[in-house]
Amino acid sequence: MTQRDILGDDSPGTEVDPASSPGIERLIHHETGLLGDIEHYDLFYGGSMWCFAEAVERGLDCRSPLLNRTVDAIYERAIMPDGGFTLQWEPRVSVACRTGDILRYLIMAGYSDTRISNGIEWILSRQRHDGGWLHCPLAGACDQLRLVLFRRSGNGLTREGDTSVTSCFYATIACALALCAYRAVDPSEAVDRAVGSAAEFFLRRSLFRSSQGTPIRPHDGNRDFRLLGYPVLSQYDILHGLLFIAHAGLIHDPRCGEAFNIVISKQNPDGTWNMESFATGMLEGDGSRRIRKSKWVTLKALRLLTIADSS
């Protein structure tokens, strides 16, 4: 991935089969032979959605029979008639953060069919007044408790048209990155406009501030957005946000400066970056939470610098 994304070398002679790596083998469910637990497909770190996403991060793509079987199983259980993806709750409702994330990984892996274009239309049609996305049936502690105890979705969709409710950072980055990935293979004015509006959502907030200007520290156990991790599903940090802004072509906007300088200031003397955030949805968030040097965070920072340098 470093050769491909940083050095620009994607020649066949440098390819390594990721399917044979220990990282991929660890993700395969021993009973079904699929990536992750398909019966509990929405679980972080063990469900098929997570294991599919991590496998794509590790280099697996649509040429892999293993990935194809897993994608088919996820489609069978999680895709909705409206084009979005649902979690394991009743009634079944599409949710923006997971729809955006899964679509992005499908596009990254090289998939291209009407289910993806329908999903992109779902995203475009649900962008909100502030340029972001929300579209989550959970709102507040009661809905969270209902989900945990009864796997019931809540009443959060009543907030969609409420302009006093700010869109969600997690849902917005998921949908925005999906649009960026789609734009690279099928550009359109509608997608360009949506990407621009989403970029403004983050830039107005310096990529980590609330509408009131204070740094966001989520109340649900997730940590400060200025702490770097490697978001996979339903997560965010400033490096993730900056990479989206870079893909949107706006990395030189002055409003990126504070977040960009924070990232640069975190580089270690040997050129690496540390894994600092282990919130649920971050890679390695289910393991040791000791801050340490990370090849994943370093790779992501180098991706950002490569795009910024070429802009």
Which residue stretches match the model-derived regions?
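Preference for long, amphipathic alpha-helical scaffolds in soluble/luminal domains
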Residues: M1-S311
